């Protein structure tokens, strides 16, 4: 690494040395020497030294069974520590210009002021900001919570070490604590003993809120408020909430039988309990701050002649919160507790606090009002008393199943066999009817009972506790109307927004027609009251058609949905179901947002934050603030300075690119007779099922092939063997065809002028740097039957061709030359990830050949390599 990253290198070196000390103390000097030899050989191998590469392979192949687990753990833990150092570096005082983005909000306001926009337009856009970040528990977060907690403490220690005026004994104390934490991590099992339950996942999400987002939000809001004041002379309203958080943890039951109505109800109570507990802590602290005596008449009317009027007001809240906390604690623990003076709405907390705020300003104490009191008001606006809203997601087939059972019971035939027109007529008739549809004596199947119970849970809770109801694999208007009828039958008194999820290429292309039909229904127009949500699926469309074709289908779908919304005077919020990887729509937030069609952000931004990406983007308060600043600046830019509409010649090229790339992708993934056996042999796909990653099964149908495999394990498996196939397969064929047709100049123009296309190429470059042809070949030679080697050789050649064609279109000399920080970050981790790949091949070979006699420690070692490679690749699923 060059001198720009000296501070990062120093921290990585220090943490590595301390890990080495822990290893030596536990395993002895000879073992540590072996680890160091492997590390040096891996670095030399990376530089192209063939002799050292062979020595590396020999050393790892000849490890005894007893050595495999500790060697795997050593490299896996080093990668985790490198990630800690890297994440800290982005928020450290020494973070160089090449690494840290200058304050994106400051840059954005400068950019907006330099444009011809009026102040009013900018102020209006800031006030209309509506960013909803949806935390999901997709099973790619392989790091245990206990280790994450130690990593957060390591970050705090690295931050403390940066202080220039530390006394020697203070510095020694911090270094000793770092050594303790590294040692604790080494002696902690990095693999969970059991899969987390959906409630465990929800608790993990709540912990992210408590430890990181709770302190980050007021700081982020203060920063935005100050920028607005400095540049435009106005302030954010007290109830402003430009960013809010929703969760799928405990609400997403699509393909997860463990997320039941009971689980959803429990998670709702836990969220409320956590929110009340956090506000109770804050209000207690606020009570000690608000000791002032001057107040307005409005406050006096509430508290009488109390000498400390603000404390008197806030103490009432504190007592209410304490009683609510006790009540909810008893409820969560399954104990009976009488209902008392409980906090049931956010307004109950907001009203007295706002009264204090305005009084302090009126009495010349605005500086005090704008301290902790304002911070609590900002948290109330963002989190409310439910902490995060809960989305509900279910497969559309499950709703149809309810009506099939019911219509058969009622002697009306089978709903599933009806035409779309007949389904709509039936559903609308029942939606308009005042009598109940479901007979009290009907005994549905367990699955149907579960669907009905979920709707009852929604009906029984506060509307503010919920986000939206998402229907997976929605393909017709009846899919949406069916959910609305189920909610009505459950006694739901509020209009829960229902969003179809269009996720295959075919569904994306048909999505606008589905919405057009829905909007032609008067009842439906009345129900939505001018507000519509539509979810765009990135994972399944890419798995279905390949990254390039899926990207264009998503863009075209968004564009036509935006036009439909404008024609119908609707506020449309597009909900982006992105993952961390390129194969699942992942891209740096700023680039991803600015590559959307013009007008697609007018209804706000709603996007999933998945698995390990939650930790990388929001795991530390300062990192979370950075991420929130980036999102905010990107949405403002996307709305006020939108990207250009694509030229007709760009569209024509993209249509051809999408068609050619999709055909090639499907010819391999669906059409090649050797593909499925090759995939199963060349990747740890079968073994991934053993890793206790998340609560959701990895397959929709237990015995299905690739098509039944969820998008996440599909991507995860290809990331492990470093072929990274879903992120690039097919794209190169489309690009090669366009160049052969004389369109190279148009492609270069698209790369320069069109953010959508440029982002596609940049994401490919990042994937190519993480991919590795010799490692992918090593998996083949050791694990794949010889008769399947031909396909592996073909795919590796296609990877090489893909790199070549992308470099032809990019002005810089090498991959990611214009993004040096990302390039250095990948280069830092590669020498530590490579030995884990070689070890994984060795372990897979031993596991598959001697499954019956395999030592349990080898199974554990295999799991460690999977987790370690995930840490090395960062965005794994």
Curated annotation (Swiss-Prot):
Cofactor: Mg(2+)
Pfam families per UniProt: PEPcase
GO molecular function: magnesium ion binding; phosphoenolpyruvate carboxylase activity
Similarity section: Belongs to the PEPCase type 1 family.
Database matches in InterPro entries: PEP_COase (IPR021135), PEP_COase_bac/pln-type (IPR022805), PEP_COase_Lys_AS (IPR018129), PEPCASE_His_AS (IPR033129), Pyrv/PenolPyrv_kinase-like_dom (IPR015813)
Full protein name: Phosphoenolpyruvate carboxylase
Gene behind this protein: ppc
Enzyme Commission number, as recorded: 4.1.1.31
GO CC annotation terms, alphabetical: cytosol
Superkingdom, taxonomy of origin: Bacteria
